[in-house]
Amino acid sequence: LVFKQKMGIFMRCYQRELQRNPELKGKVVVRFVVGADGSVPHAHLRATSLENNVVESCVVDEVSRTRFPRPDGDGSVVVSYPFNFGPL
């Protein structure tokens, strides 16, 4: 639900580069930690088939800025999330 609300931001990362390369498409998998307070202290690129550093960095940066609901319990949660990009 959190990413659904921010999907427009993630798509802007992609759309800017799509103008330069109309064939640009692929998947970006970001691995990140949701801390006990809902912040994201760590996020990094786990895998990609997009092979576009600008989009990949933008997506990782936006994930890092995202606030999530606090995880159950007192700990943190590790998540791997795939973002699929392709021309509409």
Where in the sequence are the language-model features?
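Charge-biased low-complexity segments
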Residues: 1-88
